[in-house]
Amino acid sequence: MSEKSPHHMEDATLVTTSDLLRKAGLRPTRQRMALGRLLFEGADRHVTAEQLHAEVAGLGEHVSLATVYNTLHQFKRAGLLRELAIEGSKAYFDTNTSNHNHFLLEPNGELMDIAGDAISVEGLPEPPEGMKITHVDVVVRLAKI
């Protein structure tokens, strides 16, 4: 089981989406609120922009795919999401911003959290001069047997 995301308080109640956005320095616009509710009011999850766009459209909200992409990147810059690049051009956004890794279920592309302390990464190369390693993402690919 992975660590709780910072969006969840100790007593398992949720911070309201409006409060979460304000604390991150973002104005709670209609679009941000609609997308934020889907992302943050519930269990931690992994979504693509296309999946989130389909979900918000299914609720009758009119939010363009470009706005979904822009909002996800705003949430990421504000520290509310992590972005995971899988399969080159496919990006997932993770509401659990704690230090953890992932299982990738092939072929459907579903991501599942691995607890932060379940994998130990050793023997990393020295980064080039003037650079530092900020994060290592491990994706363990799974297939049904």
Regions inferred by a protein language model and the residue ranges of each:
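DNA-recognition alpha helix
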Residues: 43, 48-61
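Intrinsically disordered, low-complexity serine/threonine- and proline-rich regulatory segments
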Residues: 1-41
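Basic amphipathic alpha-helical segments that dock to polyanions
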Residues: 68-78
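Amphipathic alpha-helical interaction segments
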Residues: 34-37, 51, 67-70
